């Protein structure tokens, strides 16, 4: 079974992917044989339909979508704002992005709002839909109902369902290909404010004057540290993917990080996708040379 990774930073890391994707295509011996890129997701700046994160990326969408099409990779717009109202549906920029995206039937939308999905289904029928993790589906029954919804091609559950292995194993075999696990979530496992955090981002993307959410989680002041993420009870390691999830019939895994630096994105790729003996080769191809100084 192939494993499909859904990578962050469609717009945010455009320059990174311009350099990385030729490497992924032409140096196949560097990467695990079973490893595929299912999609790259993100959004440009100033999109009121955006959710999950606030993007500051400013790339030409035609070039972005063309790059992904060249390598037969699905582009996904993260239009997961949870506070969309009827008045927001006519937004010119977001509609134009969807029009461009829908020129290729391989592309999709990560979505939260039912109102927005109904609108997009009618206006851009070529697009597929991914149920966003911003819904914070922590109850397995709610998650199962979401997976059963034919409107969704994929569903990203809350990361705290990642290790409910007995229930995941019992899920219908026909639904398992729809499940997309978030592997490297940095959010505190005991967080009670996850929904409110995402709502705050939705308000800001809509241009509403509001206070940003203040994270109260332990170690929040440290920022994202992959080493600490690996200690999260919900973390899905490479070994977990190969030894637990793939044998159960799961094949889709999401990597977060579009608001991080490209150095961390490379570390995620090295960890999940690159054979250990070739990790130095990938570093050298991407940035490392004999004259690079760290300090």
Can you describe what each PLM-predicted range is?
Residues 1-142, 152, 156-295:
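Active-site pocket-lining/capping segments in soluble small-molecule metabolic enzymes
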Residues 147-149:
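Solvent-exposed alpha-helices and their adjacent loops that cap or buttress functional pockets
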């Amino acid at each position: 079974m192939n494993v499909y990774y859904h990578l962050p930073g469609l717009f945010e890391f455009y320059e990174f992917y311009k350099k990385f994707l030729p490497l992924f295509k032409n140096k196949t011996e560097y990467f695990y044989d079973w490893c595929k890129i299912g999609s790259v997701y993100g959004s440009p700046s100033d999109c009121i339909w955006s959710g999950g994160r606030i993007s500051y990326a400013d790339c030409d969408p035609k070039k972005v979508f063309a790059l992904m099409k060249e390598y037969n990779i699905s582009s996904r717009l993260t239009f997961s704002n949870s506070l969309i109202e009827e008045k927001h549906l006519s937004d010119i920029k977001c509609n134009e992005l969807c029009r461009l995206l829908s020129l290729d039937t391989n592309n999709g939308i990560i979505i939260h709002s039912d109102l927005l999905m109904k609108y997009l289904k009618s206006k851009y029928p070529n697009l597929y839909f991914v149920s966003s993790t911003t819904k914070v589906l922590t109850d397995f029954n709610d998650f199962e109902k979401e997976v059963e919804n034919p409107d969704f091609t994929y569903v990203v559950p809350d990361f705290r369902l990642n290790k409910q292995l007995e229930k995941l194993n019992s899920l219908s075999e026909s639904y398992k290909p729809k499940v997309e696990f978030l592997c490297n979530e940095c959010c505190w496992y005991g967080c009670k404010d996850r929904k409110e955090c995402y709502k705050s981002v939705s308000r800001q993307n809509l241009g509403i004057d509001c206070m940003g959410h203040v994270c109260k989680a332990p170690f929040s002041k440290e920022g994202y540290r992959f080493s600490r993420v690996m200690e999260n009870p919900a973390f899905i390691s490479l070994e977990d993917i190969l030894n637990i999830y793939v044998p159960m019939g799961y094949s889709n895994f999401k990597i977060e990080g579009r608001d991080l630096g490209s150095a961390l994105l490379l570390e995620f790729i090295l960890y999940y996708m690159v054979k250990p003996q070739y990790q130095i080769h990938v570093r050298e191809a991407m940035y490392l040379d004999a004259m690079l100084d760290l300090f």
